[in-house]
Structure formats: C-alpha cells, structure tokens
C-alpha cells in the first residue's frame, strides 16, 4: 500500500530547536543550526525507515488565519518566535526544494488545516496517510487510512490509529477529541475551554453526553458548581470547540504526482549542507561517492540576510583537495634518508608532527608511522615496522629531534602523540602548539577535529581515515594492514594541514586575546595531563569485589521489599511500570505528572519530591542509586584496568566543556559520587602506588570566593577574610542572627542560596530544591541580595556586558560566547543570561586550578620528586606520595594552590592524607 507522510513543519522545527537549547548547534559562522539539524534528522529517519511513496511539508502562512481573525487571543500567549527559528525556516525551505519535497501552504489557514484536508483526501483514495506531529489536536483526524505519527519523548515514534487515540483519551471515537479540547481548553494554543474543567472531567462529560452540543442541551442533568460553570461558559465552550476544529475543506488540491518522493538535486543539496557544515548529514542524504567530489562550490550568500556579529572564522569560497593543489609528500623508508631529513629538521625552528598508530588508546597504541612537516604543502612520512626492536631503532633516529627544546612542536591533539612516543622512550621537549586547543580557545562552542577545522579555516577537504581503513565496525581494518604507499598521502597531509592550521590560528589567538592563556596555561598543562594519563591510578579490586557483594545483597533485599509494598513483582528498571505501580495502582498522589505521550513521569527529581508520600518511593530511589553505582563503578572499574600496567588510565579532555573545566573519559572519573556511604566506598578503592601515601587537596568554596572577588561585595569579602563558615555567615546576615545561633536548617538554606544564585536559580527553582513555599524562597533571595547587594550588581553587569559584546570572560580572558543573549524569546534569553553570570565564575575557578597544576608539576620536576599527581576532579587534586616526600609535597601543593591567583579574599585549599582516596579526602 502506498504511504503518504505529511509533516507539521513548525511543530517539528520548534521541537528540534528546544531539544538542543542547553547545548545549541552553532557553526563556524555563528549560525544556530539546531532547528535545521533536528528537522533534517527527522526527515532522514522517515525516508530511510518508513520509505514513504509520497511526502509533503506543511507550513503556517505569513499573516492572519481564520482563527486569529475570529479570536485575536488565539496563540497570543506564545513568546515571540526565536530569531534562530526565523532564520532556520528559509533554510529548511531551501533544503526541501533541493530534496524536491513540496512545501504546502494556504493563505488564511494553519498547517493543521492543510494537513487535515490533504490527509482525508488521500485516505479516501486508499493511500495510507501519516501525519507527523507532536500536537494532540490531530487526533480528531485519525480514521481509516489516516494515522498520527508522533515523536516519542526520549526518541523514536509511535503510530496512533483510531483505536489508540480513543484509548489514549478515554473516548468512543476520534471526532470527540475536539469536544474534549472545547471543554478542557488547550494552553498551547490559548484556547480557553471551560474554566475549572480539566481532562478528567471533560472525558467524563463527553462519555456521558457524546458531544459539546449534546452537553449544552442537557445541562439540567448536571449538578452544583459544574452545572454553573458549564452554563455560564456555554458560548466560550462552543467557541473553543470551533478554534480546536481542524478544517478539512481548505482550497488545496491533492496532487500525488507532485508529492511523490524522488531523487534530490544533489548539487544544490550539497551546496546547502556544505554551507551549514553538516558533513554527517551530507553523507547520510547524498551518495558517498558523490559526496567525496573534491571541488564543491559554496554559495556564500545563501544566508546573507542574517549576518552574524562577532564572527571569528570565515569560509573560503571552495573546498579544495590534495589532488588539486601542488604539494610534495615523500615516503622515507630507508635509514640513510631518515637521518638526512632528521638533520634537516634539526635546523628548523618549528616542526609539525603526527603519529599513525594501531589504537586510539595511547597507552595501548603501537607506532605504524611518523609524519613531519616544516613547510606548508611539504611533508614526509616514515613507516615504522611491526617488530618492536626494529621500530625502536627508527624512533631513536628521530629522538634527538623530538627532544630538542629549541624547536617548537606543533600537533593536533599533541598529548596523544606525546604519550605514544613516551612508550618508545621519547620525551617530547620544546614549546608546544596544539591546534585543537588553539581552536577551542578561539571558538569553544564549535567542533575541533582536524577535518572540520580544515574545511572551515582553510577551505580544504582532508582525506578521511575511513577512505583507507573503511567505516567503523568489525570489518574496519587497522593502519597496520595497509602498505606505506597507501598511507603516505593521508599521514603526510595530517602533519601538513596541522602546520597550516597553526599558521592560521596563531594570529587569531592574539585577536581574541587568549595568547597568554594558551601559552602559559593550556600548553604547559598538556605535559601535566600526558604524564597523569600515563601514570594512571591504582584500583583495589579486592575492596571493590567486597563492596559489590555487599551492595548486590542489599539490592536484592530492596527489590523484595519493593515487591512487598507494591503487592506484585514488576520491572523496577522500567519507568512505565514504576509509574503504573506508583500512580495507577497505589495512587500516591492525586494528580501525577505525565509526559506528552501520557506516560507517568518517574524521574529522580519527581520521585525525590514524593519520597515522603510512601515508603516504596524511597526504596525505588535507593534501588536506582545502587544499580547505577554497581553498573557504572563497582563492577565496571575492574574491567577498565589495563592488564599491562595494572592501572586505570583515564583521558583528560581540555576541549570538551564550554567553561574551560577539564573533563575525563574512558572512564569518566569526574562523576565519581562524593556523598552517601555507598559512594564513599568507590573512593576507598582508589589507592596510591605500592608503599606510597594518598594525598588529596581541594579548594574550599572556590566559586564563591571568585564571586566575592568579581562582585567586590564588602559583606561577602569580610565573611571570607574573617575565616567564618561562609554559609553560616550568610545565614546570620539574612536571618539577622548571631552566627553562633544559626540553625542547621538556616545554614542549609543559605548554602543552597549561595550556590544556587551563582547558577542563576529562580524563585521556583529554589522553592523546589529546599521544599519551601515560593514566598519563602522569594524572601530568601531578596534577603540574600540585601545582604550582598554587589552580588546583584555583578549579575546585572555581567548580563549587560554580554549583551553589548556578545561574550563574557574569565580572569584569564577565556571567552564564553552567548549568541542568544539578546533573544526576544524569554526561555532562550534566560539560558544565555544564566551563562553570562556563571561562566566567568566557573571558568575562572577552572583556570585557577590549571595554573596550580602547572606550577605543582614544575616544582616536582625542579626538586626531582618521585611523588606523582594522579587525578584531578573539579576543584580537587590527588597524589601518590613517596613517604619521605610527605612534608615537601604538602608544602608545595598548598603553596601553589593557594597562590595560583591573587583574589580579594583568601584562596584556601583543604588537604588530607590516607591509605586511599576516601581516607585522604
């Protein structure tokens, strides 16, 4: 049977845009591509999974519709369309044109009406029709051959036929959806309905009377307040039904030939995807062979009506490839030539280097080849044999070059190359220049991989590794499987392009004002992190095994208790089944929250609020916590121990966060739980080297101290300088108590206010977090700003600075760009404003600990200490310490942490010693 898909464009565009609201997709020209990307992903998913015969996309028209003419308040409550969505719409229409997919519009009618009319016509002709939309009002159109295709919360789609729509809303037939909406209204469209009548009552009334009209004719059968509400609002109910009714007689023709899915205009589609920097989507939509054509003209003025301020990078007019450019790449495969080029490189001041290896994990990688470049478009590739002894001989030829401190070493993610070379006895020396980190400091929100940077900075399309070893998967080859002749262009290009990127990015660092941050903090930190990753950290597997046994037994006991309380067994890991037990069977609350698809919400946040309602809620939360602890850490960590070293080797990432904080992966040690007895057991398993001590030092309330410095608030500065507990001091001032009389509850509230306000917490957010009324939360925030007036001034000034220049900065001039700071949409603007307040605080704190790490590392080297820095977790540094160096290490660490930056308040670090991380922390 033929299939027709009709897309509700704006509903999907809005959904896509807000899905990325916390982490918007911004390309190198500053264009927010979230809405376009999300829409394209949906389109591709439908085309590949559902393989429709016909497809059309309906848009709301410009100007009024019959509903707004009849009711000026229709949708009037909605905030102004975000600028980024307005910019996205013409781009999406251009994409659809290139895809040869019709855009469906009718003056005076909404997309709903156009879809409704075409869906019914197509269904009547025997075409199975799917209306792709998240909007519930489409349920009224569902009938034979006409179904809803609705995005699920969290991914995927659900198909709703007439039976499912009726079951969902508890009605007899789908036409009654409009009767429900007429009674209960629809806040999304500002349809008023009948005041005081919710979904439950509306369903009951429609099941009893059949329709709004029948109900209004028989109001004498109603009683009390409900009778009065319905009679007093009869006209409003009828009018609400009119507004909710989707028109099915719009003057549009069903032309299946025009709607037939066909091959796209590949050249035009490629132009648009290239301009958007959608490489993955281009690969998805276009034939791979076509997509790899090496000359792609970019229509630079495609989006010229929306220029972006503060643009750092511009795109060249075409993407060039290696075979179009004069270049000299040489394969060096004999010892005599190797020595000659090494001597040649030793006369240069700058060397771009790269390694080809067998693994993306540096600790396990073996060398396949070495690449070098000292001049743009010239590069050399040296293959390295499999035999370790032979490989070492070749590395030794270049060892003096790598270890020459007078030569600047340039690399893309150079930390990886340094670690690989370290396993061959090479200690890379000299000033470093990492192109990935340089690009990150200039535009932190963008991608920083070489392929992307080559395209956006150099207008150059690199050879992709998949062209050599195939796509990811079981059949992907290793670089070791290829002869050197096949690798040379790819490997030499890496070193060459890295050098070109260095020459392009270096002046940009100066333009943005981050040269000092780059050379004095981020580049020295590369060495620190490389050594920490190579050192790794020891894990007490016996302790973890014991913890696993204890927690698994507890988990089993909790499960039994949950089943007892529920009166039946069910899948505790299933949110759906948990919701049905808590709210369907036990009815622990009268009006539980539901998702748009009608499923009960059982998130941790919701269950925390309900934990006092029934014992089962606390048990489910406890079960979830233990399950996560076991799966993520207790049972997982032993499997991550490297069998050769006996250590866990995490990767520290310098370019993963917008704020400048370090993150870690494989495994993520930043999220190891701190609170709770069970979480502490994890830290207990982290131990120092054999015969060593574990030393931990962490900053005390560094973000609040940074806030005190930035705001210059005298009261906050005085509280820190006097050495008081800052939260007790805050509570004393807010509640006008002597600090000795502050209660634990008052201190807790002040602590939440202290940290919450840094993150731009609202009255509603603080009320929820503290489980207090909004009035009390409002009084607490007001009291806070009366106590610390300059904190409020700082917050307002930070937002104003961001509005004027488009970004905010840390102490060290690290920038956070905020393209949405002047948005007319309150939700979007609110995110940007909170980031304007928080980014300088969190970013400065991140920079301070980086400074401390660099200085501590240098002091350890200068004093020839054998003790090692092994972990960094947010504001905390951890060390494996040789016992006789104990006093020296503590002195150095505290001196450098507390002296990393001169604040108006003391920078304090607390420290501790032990046999493991828990004891030391």
Placement of each model-derived feature along the sequence:
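Noncatalytic, basic helical substrate-engagement surface that gates or grips nucleic-acid strands
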Residues: 2-132, 136-163, 236-239, 245-253, ...
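Helix-hairpin-helix
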Residues: 185-208, 273-277, 540
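C-terminal polymerase-core module
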Residues: 553, 557-560, 564-618, 786-838, ...
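Short alpha-helix plus adjacent loop in nuclease-associated cores
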Residues: 73-87, 143-172, 227-229, 380-400, ...
